């Protein structure tokens, strides 16, 4: 039975934190990395609304919205439709960040997405990766290489789309929130997002490139808090 490890972000040294627990089963089990975040507080019944709850609710809208309806009718009307159709609970709908969604709707990046000739949204993948690539420990790396241990990396990419000129673009929506002081320096906010998520997006880019049979030309974060895209690669 494969061992499972759930983490919020993938990074190259993750096995160094779990090496002791996995040492007895090297070569016999796989470790599953799952980047999907746990349910927010309002879903699990906890009282109070946190910034992360607002971000999670807004991300659910992005997951299920119909782009053409959203573009034509606006965020509030599309949110009502998603609520009526059961995609979003009424409690969740109350805390969706409408202003952030309207900024996205009016952005040039959303225009690019709507003009795409191919669009894969909520693109789920499972990929076997060499375990040796997830440790900086020379001895553990050698042991894992000799044993041929693999990790099953699971993930969900928000969108991969192809433009008319064949450019293949990957985008991951991020709802990280910033303090007022941080928001005064947009370059610093971009640096924080890039530093926080670039490892995860490297895996996404490489794995999606393998699945699509060609390299991803551009990899972006779209920050709902900042209201713009950030080119990572």
Question: Could you describe each region identified by the protein language model?
Answer:
Residues 1-233:
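Structural signature of nuclease core domains in nucleic-acid processing machines
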